């Protein structure tokens, strides 16, 4: 009985760790997109200053 509970608990921990890794990867992807957009805006802003 204790062994079954321990195995179930270990599986839950593994699922949580997998979810955490997936969320971390998603956050890193979003930050990457934000960085690209920031660079695009900076470039657009520089072009505006050049033309004005």
UniProtKB/Swiss-Prot annotation:
The alphabetized UniProt keywords are: Coiled coil
Coiled-coil ranges (or none): 3-46
Q: What is this protein called?
A: Putative uncharacterized protein DDB_G0293430
Organism in which the protein naturally occurs: Dictyostelium discoideum
